[in-house]
Amino acid sequence: MNPSIIYASNSGFGPEGEWSRNGSMDAVCQAMSGAAVAQGGGPSHEPVLIENCPADQSGAWNFAFSIVSALFHRERTGRGQWLQTSQL
């Protein structure tokens, strides 16, 4: 295999663990992270989803930043990397 290849994968819950085979989307991440409860005013209130899909966006930003960082690393060292990121 070419040692300078950058292989990147992104999933909802990571490549291993009990949730690894499940898909994910913004509402799931907000619910599981507690963001929907916090936005709704706390545990004694109804959860409220944050508009504009922040978990979808931040997951994509983290994935893109990981790739850019790997490109910088390859520019300096000539070596690629295997990246695994998750939405949550």
Predicted region positions:
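Active-site-adjacent "lid/gating" segments in soluble enzymes
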Residues: 1-88
